[in-house]
Amino acid sequence: DNREARALWETQGIAVGQVGNKQPVVACLFPGQGSQYPGMLREIIAACPQASLLKEQMNQSLLKMGHPTFEDIIDNHEQTLGKDVFRTQLSMLLADTLVFKILQEMGLRADRLTGHSYGEFSALHAADAFQFENAVQATLFRCKSIEEAPIEGGLVSCAAGEDVVAAACASFPEDVFVANCNSPQQTVVGGEDRSLRRFVEFIQSEGIRTTTLDVPRPFHTPLMKPAQKPFKRALVSV
């Protein structure tokens, strides 16, 4: 029932609707790592038969490829979300894909598709550039390239604009980099864990609020460079 599904979407912060008579241009932005949480979409799957069917179809593909199922990943019994890179990124591919396909069944027709960070893999699948199995395989290659490279660190969100945060990074005596500019009042920085902890103290002393993101690497910073070449080589086979 679409009305029941729409009510559940709204509890998740997802709005579905149309304003006015003119058909709008519809853009879908797929979230990436850091948006995951245990039990994602549990209520929607329980209430929506189409969602349950899609989940089972994804499970069949995952099992054939030797990977854990949707439930194994999302229920997070092993406390791996946010720590295990592959399970965390795969959780976002599964959730992004399921939500997008259900919205399509509800009548959504997207004119533009894009992804935030890892969300580009979900966007590529939604655009049919990747089949589901290819998206999973590319995710695995991406994660192996990251995990096998000598990279440690994380990300911190700062409640300030890029100019302010970039200036703070420049005046800080250790390597901390601007990683994402999410909005005029939210900028994400990345670095090694020890440097990030000191940077948080430094920027908080300037009256700027911070949030440590649930990610295991300093994504979108120069520190990720060792993972680039191995990933590029692996993508050739996808």
PLM ranges: what are they?
Residues 1-43, 79, 97-101, 105, ...:
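Short, low-complexity connector segments at domain boundaries
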